[in-house]
Each structure stands twice: as structure tokens, then as C-alpha cells.
């Protein structure tokens, strides 16, 4: 069984959904990033979604876009991201590790090499937010050849054809977005209609559904679980916490000014978000 299957089975038996934080790798440095990831896991994260910094993150709002920039200002490369994933995998052998990476990266490295490298580092799944499922065939083939679960986004207003394609192609989980647009707590998730979003995808079968985009509070998590999702992904809210403890001006590297304060704030936030996954 895959790590995702193990996780969803365990959580289902416990009457819980999954809480999955999105964290940008190397923001603001590799060592800081490892400590942030460790804090998230120890505070209750069930799985990880890790970003690889990119210079033109079109699917991200301002908060996450700035985290790409901080990591790049600190010298982040794809190779340093792979090294950090391997370090996380060695420290936490059971946790599912999902990647969020823009499509230019696999094109630059070559599809087969790209998926093989991330599999060898310890990643379980890869989502390319700028690659729709209708263009996914070569990525799916390369991912499955390397033992990586391909993940696709199910947009809130997707056509029947898209939802059917996403449900068939996504392994591990399906990333359903609670509203269309870019990531971020700048626009909070609308909890009205979440059940319709989830039910619409479930009609086609497929992997468990994780809801993302604009999920920034325990209530949003609880609403996602109540709507029938298997869990929720939170990114911008966590990235904002990290940013509030960083000091530095682009293009210079940023530093974390209060590591203990950051650890405490992240722990409190993630613990509260995880507590909201308990099914009523």
C-alpha cells in the first residue's frame, strides 16, 4: 500500500480527516525550512505538500509568490530542494510527501529524469498546477514509470470531461479547489456549496479528495470535512506566519528573526487546524 492509502485508512478508522500544510522548500533557507517542516509534522500534519521555488508562479497569490522569491533569494535550486526532501524522508519515513512544482521544471530537466529524481529523494506525488489533465498524458506516463502518483486539480467550475479526467488520472488524492482563482488567504474559501463541489467529483470515483485554496481557519477545515472531503490543504496562512518572522529585502537573503516564536506560532496554528479534522 502507498503512504497515502495507509494515511487515509488510518485516519478513516480514527474518524478524522487529513490536515496537509503547504510549505515552500528553502524558505528562507534549507535549514530553516527543515525546522519548519519538522515543526509542522510534530504539531500534527498528516501529510506534506512541498513547493519547489519558481520565478513565475502563476497559480499563486501574493503571499505564496513572495515565498518563492525569498527561497530563490536564498539561493534555492532544484538540486537543493531534492536534498531537503531526502533529509525530510530520512527523518520521517512514513509521512506522505506531495510536491507542487511548475511545469517548466520537468521540461527543463527532462520528464523521466525529473520524476526519477523526485522518487529517489522520497516524494510520493507531484502536482503541476499549470498542467491541466487534458495535457497530462506524457507527465502521467513518466510519473507512473518512476513510482510517483500524478495529481491533478479539479477546478470548482470544471466540465464533466475535466472532472472525469482528473478522477481517472489522479492517484494518491485529488486536489479539489473550493473556489477558482489563485491561492491565498487574500480570498477566503467560500464554504457554501462545498458539498456540491465534493459530490460532483465523487460521482466519477477516484482517489480521496483534499480541498484547497483559501483554507485558512479551523472552521474552513471542519467545513471541508463536513462536506465529505478526506482532508484539507492550507498554504498561504502558514506562509504568512513564516513571512511575519522573516527579515530581509529582495534581492538579499531573508533570515528568521525569532525561531522560537515562529515554532510556537506554527505549532499552535497547525494543532488547531488538525483538531478541526475530527468528524462530527
Swiss-Prot record:
Gene Ontology molecular function, alphabetical: tryptophan synthase activity
Catalysed reaction equations from the record: (1S,2R)-1-C-(indol-3-yl)glycerol 3-phosphate + L-serine = D-glyceraldehyde 3-phosphate + L-tryptophan + H2O
Active site: 49 (proton acceptor), 60 (proton acceptor)
UniProt superkingdom: Bacteria
Protein's pathway: Amino-acid biosynthesis; L-tryptophan biosynthesis; L-tryptophan from chorismate: step 5/5
GO cellular component term, pick one: cytosol
Pfam families to which the protein is assigned, alphabetical: Trp_syntA (PF00290)
InterPro entries for the chain: Aldolase_TIM, RibuloseP-bd_barrel, Trp_synthase_alpha_AS, Trp_synthase_suA
EC identifiers of the protein: 4.2.1.20
UniProt keyword list: Amino-acid biosynthesis, Aromatic amino acid biosynthesis, Lyase, Tryptophan biosynthesis
Gene3D superfamilies linked to this entry: Aldolase class I
Self-association and partners: Tetramer of two alpha and two beta chains.
Function: The alpha subunit is responsible for the aldol cleavage of indoleglycerol phosphate to indole and glyceraldehyde 3-phosphate.
Family: Belongs to the TrpA family.
NCBIfam families: trpA
Protein name: Tryptophan synthase alpha chain
UniProt lineage: Bacteria, Bacillati, Actinomycetota, Actinomycetes, Mycobacteriales
Gene: trpA
